[in-house]
C-alpha cells in the first residue's frame, strides 16, 4: 500500500509538471510574429508568490532586442502552450485541470526592451468564469483556461484605440486555481511582450503595480474550485473601458479560430546589428548570429540563432521541442 501511494503521488507530480505552460507567441491582426518580441521565461513553471517582483514578467526571462509594432485599436492574439517551441494543437494549451482566469495588462514604458515592469499596469482584457448550469462544482464551470484549450492556446485581445502611442509591455497571465484552496497554492503563468503602439490617442489609464495588485488572500486567488461556486471575484482591477472581455465558455472567433501556424502571413522583425535574440523566421538565424543567455537556441521547427553568447551553452530543456542558452 505504501509503495502504491508513493507511486501514485509520483505520477500526480509528473502530471502536474507536464501541465505547466507558457505564453510564448503573438499574432497581430492575424499576422504571425511567433516568439520574436516575447520575454520567454526560463521554464514553464509558475510563479506562486504574489509579493515577488517575479509576478511582473516571470522568472529568468530573456529580453529580446526587438519590439512588435501594433496599431492602437488593432487585435493581438496571445498564444500559450505547455512545452516551449511546441505550437501544435494536439495537446491542451494548459492541461492538468489547471482551471482559472486569463487576464492581460499593459504598461506604458520609455523603452520596452529595457523596462523592468515596475511602472503601472492597466487591465485590457479578461476571460474569467461563468456558471455551468449542468455542473456541480467549480471544476465543471466555464473558465478562461478552458477557452484557451478550445482555441489551440489562442486568445484575442483588443489594444485600446485611445491610448497614447509609444512603447508598452503587454503582460498575458493565467491564474491556475486547481490547488488554490490553501494560501500560496494559486499558480501564476505570465509572459511579457514588448510592443510599440502607434496611433493618435492621448488616454493614460489609471494603473496598479506588480507586486501590489494581488494579495494571497484575495477571494479570486485563495479559493476552492472543487466545491460548488455561485460567483467568482476576478483578481486585480476592472478592465479599462477601451479594452475587451470574453465570456467564459464562448466559442473561438477571429484569429482564435482561423490562424494556423505555417499557413498564413508571418512577419520577421529587423534585428539590431548587435543581435541578441533569435527569430522564428526562415533565414533569420542559424550559426551566423548569437542568442543571449536564457534565450531559445534550438528545437522542433526552430530556425533562429543556434550559437549561444559567451558563458552559456545551448542545452536541451524540453527535447525535442526546445533548447535554451543556459
Curated annotation (Swiss-Prot):
PROSITE patterns: CBM1_2
GO MF entry, a single one: monooxygenase activity
Ubl conjugation among keywords: no
InterPro entries documented for this protein: AA9, AA9_LPMO, CBD_sf, Cellulose-bd_dom_fun
Domain CBM1: 289-326
Signal peptide location: 1-19
Biased composition (Low complexity): 265-281
Keywords, comma-separated and alphabetical: Carbohydrate metabolism, Cellulose degradation, Copper, Disulfide bond, Metal-binding, Monooxygenase, Oxidoreductase, Polysaccharide degradation, Secreted, Signal
Binding site for O2: 178, 187
UniProt-recorded name of the protein: AA9 family lytic polysaccharide monooxygenase B
Record organism: Thermothielavioides terrestris (strain ATCC 38088 / NRRL 8126)
Lineage: Eukaryota, Fungi, Dikarya, Ascomycota, Pezizomycotina
Name of the coding gene: LPMO9B
Amino acid at each position: 500500500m505504501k509503495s502504491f501511494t508513493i507511486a501514485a503521488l509520483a505520477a500526480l507530480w509528473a502530471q502536474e509538471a507536464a501541465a505547466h505552460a507558457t505564453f510564448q507567441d503573438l499574432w497581430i491582426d492575424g499576422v504571425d510574429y511567433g516568439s520574436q518580441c516575447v520575454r520567454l521565461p526560463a521554464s514553464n513553471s509558475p510563479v506562486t508568490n504574489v509579493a515577488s517582483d517575479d509576478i511582473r514578467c516571470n522568472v529568468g526571462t530573456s529580453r529580446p532586442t526587438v519590439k512588435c509594432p501594433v496599431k492602437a485599436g488593432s487585435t493581438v492574439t496571445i498564444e500559450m502552450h505547455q512545452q516551449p517551441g511546441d505550437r501544435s494543437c494536439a495537446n491542451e494549451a494548459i492541461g492538468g485541470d489547471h482551471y482559472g482566469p486569463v487576464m492581460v495588462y499593459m504598461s506604458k514604458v520609455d523603452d520596452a526592451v529595457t523596462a523592468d515592469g515596475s511602472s503601472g499596469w492597466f487591465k485590457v482584457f479578461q476571460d474569467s468564469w461563468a456558471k455551468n448550469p449542468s455542473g456541480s462544482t467549480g471544476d465543471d464551470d466555464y473558465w478562461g483556461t478552458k477557452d484557451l484549450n478550445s482555441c489551440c492556446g489562442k486568445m484575442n485581445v483588443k489594444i485600446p484605440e485611445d491610448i497614447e502611442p509609444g512603447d508598452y509591455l503587454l503582460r498575458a497571465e493565467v491564474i491556475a486555481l486547481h490547488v488554490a484552496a490553501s494560501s500560496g497554492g494559486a499558480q501564476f503563468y505570465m509572459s511579457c511582450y514588448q510592443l510599440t503602439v502607434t496611433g493618435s490617442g492621448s488616454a493614460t489609464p489609471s494603473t496598479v503595480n506588480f507586486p501590489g495588485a494581488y494579495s494571497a488572500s484575495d477571494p479570486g486567488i485563495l479559493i476552492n474550485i472543487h466545491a460548488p461556486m455561485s460567483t467568482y471575484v476576478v483578481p486585480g482591477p476592472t478592465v479599462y473601458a477601451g479594452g475587451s472581455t470574453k465570456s467564459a465558455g464562448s466559442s473561438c472567433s477571429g484569429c482564435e479560430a482561423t490562424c494556423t501556424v505555417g499557413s498564413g502571413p508571418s512577419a520577421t522583425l529587423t534585428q539590431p546589428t548587435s543581435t541578441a535574440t533569435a527569430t522564428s523566421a526562415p533565414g533569420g538565424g542559424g550559426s551566423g548570429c548569437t542568442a543571449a543567455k536564457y534565450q531559445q537556441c534550438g528545437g522542433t521547427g526552430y530556425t533562429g540563432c543556434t550559437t549561444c553568447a559567451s558563458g552559456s551553452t545551448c542545452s536541451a530543456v524540453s527535447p525535442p521541442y526546445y533548447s535554451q542558452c543556459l
